[in-house]
Amino acid sequence: MNEKDSPLTLTRRSALMAGTALLAAVPLGFMKNAQAALPAFDASYPGFALADIIGDDSLERIQRKGEIIVCTSNDWPYSYLDANTGAFSGIDAEILLLAAKLLKIDKVTVQTVPFDGMVPGVLAGRFDMVGDSIHFSPERAKVVDFSFPTYFYAETMVVKKDSGIRVNTIEQLSGKSCGTLLGTHYSEWIQKAPGVQFKGYKDAEALVQDVASGRLDAAVYDLPVMVGLMKNNPQWPLEIVTTYQARTLKIPSNYSRYIFKQKDQQLINAFSRAIEWIQYSGQMREILKKWGLGEEAN
């Protein structure tokens, strides 16, 4: 029995599919629309097909155009333009480039914006999708739709070395300052914490540098980013708060996803089908391993 057919995989698949059905259900209005001609797909990938994709013709329009416009916050290690080569790189970049091949989309055009500008940019029609690591929230779900889950990671807290800060929660930082990137769900947590002074940032490096310089008491952000920044900048006097208990639990709603306009149901369903294939073919595991994420992320 291969991995795809194993009981363990089927159990996990059922859980993820249940989460996806709950969080990104297809509106009934689109279900009633007449189905357009089936979009093209690359049949050379075993087991991948779009035979029952429903909705409008949003994928077909992109296929005819030959290009999908993706926005990213240029955030290592997720989705960024390499400073040396200009290549679209990172965990999400590799997932999306493979998905584009599966869906016969000839060109992926990447545009960088601040994190809090990605969803507004999609809603305004400047981008076809958010191609960066982003999570479900009830507020976002009111205006956009989400793809099938991709991978998981939690947040961590970073402070200046020898600061003496040893807390379990953000709320225990009362009387101190705490920062994160604007537009993230972490920013919502910090702003709701009584007595905690919130400071928002446009990029993770500036966030962590303020902690290292003493301008900010603590930073809460994605564990992979924090570890990477500390590894690449050993001169910064930083440490992870080992007593901090992450609020991000490993459940379907906390997996990273991609964001689309609600009306683009064919495109959403097609990308979800491609991501599902990447998950259960084992390709996702290989991508995550390449970027230093272990089995806990899959």
Residue spans for each PLM region:
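N-terminal secretory signal peptides
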Residues: M1-S14, A18-L28, Q35
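Ligand-binding clefts/hinges and TM-proximal coupling segments of bilobed small-molecule sensing domains
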Residues: A40-A51, H185-Y201, L238-T242, N269-N298
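Acidic, polar ligand-binding/catalytic clefts
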Residues: A43, L97, V108-Q172, Y244-I251
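Short helix-initiation/N-cap motifs at beta->coil->alpha
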Residues: T109-P120, K199-S213
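Periplasmic-binding protein-like
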Residues: Y151-V159, V227, K231-I275, G292-N298
